[in-house]
Amino acid sequence: MKTKKLGNSDIETSEIGLGCMTMTGIYGPADENESIATIHAAIDNGVSFIDTADAYGGGSNEILVGKAIADRRDKVVLATKFGNIYAKDSERGADGRPEYVREACEASLKR
């Protein structure tokens, strides 16, 4: 698997990443064991860039990814996103306030 430096940092990651959005039922039912096996297979085959977001399943995707990489954390560059807000009435919005950024990052780290 080809790798490259992430921006100007010393972090090196695979050129191919694994997006995990659909692993928590965004487009229909998802099997947790199958999703974890998929993440493990990707890592075993050299994929080190794993992508998730707090909006995927209301944080459940981050929990799933965390469970999958728990014993492989040193092999993974983990990316998450935040800022998408979903209200109870299905209204969408965005929040980029500094206090929300901190809150979202802390919540993602806990998951």
Language-model features: locations:
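Conserved catalytic core of Hanks-type protein kinase domains
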Residues: 42, 81, 111
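Glycine/proline-rich, positively charged
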Residues: 88-111
